[in-house]
Structures are given as C-alpha cells and as structure tokens.
Amino acid sequence: MSWKAAPSNVSAGGGTMGAMASKGKPSPRSAVKPLSDEQVAKLARKHHLVDPTHDFPTGPRKANTAEIEAQNPKATHRLLAGCDVVLRNHSKVKAWGLEHVPETGPFITAATHVTMYDVFVPMVSLFHQGRRPRYMAKAEMAKWPLIGKWFQLVGMQPVQRRAGKAKAIEETSVEILTSGRPLTVWPEGTVTRDPQKWPMSMKNGVGVIALESSRRLGCQVPLYCAVTWGAASINHWWPWPRKNVVMCYDEAFDYADLLDGCDSWGDEVPTDRADELTRRIRVRMTEIMAEIRGEQAPDGYWDYRTMSRVKD
C-alpha cells in the first residue's frame, strides 16, 4: 500500500495520551520578552501574514456546512464573537499557512500550549476557514463558569486525565477522524513548564492517533502543527499596549515511512513509531517557534516528569 496523504474528500466507516496532572507552575510572563514589531515585519517579508479571524489567505472558502450544522452554529457564533473581542482588545494577531487547511475530510491539528491563546487562536482560525474540529481538552474546562458550556457546544471532547483512561481517549479520537471529522490536540497535555516557554515533552498519544486512524482509513491522515507565540508576555489585567501574536499553520507532515508494514501491527500501534512521530512533531514545533521568536532554540527539551532540560 502506498501511504500518501488522504485526499481532501476522504470519508470512512470504521502509546498514550497519558494522565497529565498539573505539575509545577508555568514561568511568569516576565520570563520572556514581547514579540517586537520589527520581528513581525521580518516575518511578513518572508510569509504572507493575515488576520486569521477575518482574512482568507487564498480567497473566500466554501464552509463545511455539515460540520457547522452538527456543532451548534448559534453557540459557535457567540463564542467566536466573544473570542474576537478578547483577541482584538488584548493583541494584534497575525498568521501564515492557513491555506493548508483542507476544505473537507479529516485532519489533525497538533497545537502548542504556551498560554490559553494557543487554544483560542487555532480554534477561531479554523472556524473562520469553515472547519469545525473536535477538540481534545481536559474535562475540568467543561466546568469553567460561562465558557465551559460553550466549549462543549462547539466541539470539545472532554479528556479525563486519570490513569487507565489513555486507551479510551485514543479510541475516541480515532473514531472522530475515521468518521470524517477533523481533530485538534495539544500534545504537551498542559501549559508548557519550560522556563523560557519552548515546547516541552509530549505524550505520544498524538502519534498513536495519527498512525491508527491512517491505518484504518488506508491513507495518511493529514497532520499539521499550529504554533502560536507572543501571548506569553500579555498582562491580562492591563493588556495595553496590545502585544503581537503570530501563529504558523505549518504544511502537512509526511510520516508515510512510519506506516510501513502497519498491516502486521496487531491490535496496537508500535510504541517506537508513535514515539518517533511525536518527537518529530515536537522538533518541528520548536523550529517554527524559533523562527517566530527570531531566537535560537536551546539544546534539548524540557522534560515534564523530571522538570529539567534533557538531550534529544
């Protein structure tokens, strides 16, 4: 079988995300400097930066009406309106790469998790492009005042972050994709604990989900990295002057080599293959973030379990 990326109109029938409880505290916003106007201008000379909440990088797109109708359009509209107000009052958001978003069919968005902006910016951007992914998010978010109910109405898939739940989470995620719906995940599982807010160690569930859903569909499910940077320095009590926030929606991963021989895997994706795909995602996220920040990424990565920097 040739493991090429799934065509945009694919539909179908039929490691671990891990229980990651909070550990330590994220570093304060003073730990990083704001994203400067000069750096945004430098990025704009290389990439086509757009307002992801209002602009279409390649012209207006045909919305996926089936997804929209299935995901409470009235609640979605209200949430987007609220997010738009917050984003515009607190920041100046730009993005590149949204032309990569498929108009139809399943795909996976693996997003960074520096701040809550890493939730809202990709969400609003994909909604504006006419897609309605399901979101894997910690179950506690459903209990948040006011917006918790909205999260459930607009596609949140609650994640019970307890031991023994990983397989169920992965199976639910695979079923979402094999039904033809897109899925968004945050592989770090919680806000990064890296003192300088680089991507940290990730659970290999994103690798399991991508590989298993591709095996069941018989084609490589498109997998994209969404990297957001700039919100870490925002003071939410007094956000002015507004800070720059930039998101990159990267081109699709090619992980066909990891699908070789998948018919002989048995009931589970080999751990080494899920680990390798997850590692590639982390490395790529770090490369993109380094470009957005205009900085050299530190060697290695921050390990959540040991709360220290380790070698790759």
Label every PLM stretch briefly:
Residues 82-113:
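Helix-to-loop junction immediately C-terminal to a conserved catalytic motif
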Residues 3, 13-54, 58-60, 167-312:
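Non-catalytic C-terminal accessory region of glycerolipid acyltransferases
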Residues 65-79:
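Helix-enriched interaction subdomains in cytosolic or periplasmic regions
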Residues 101-163:
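Catalytic core of membrane glycerolipid acyltransferases/transacylases, capturing the structured
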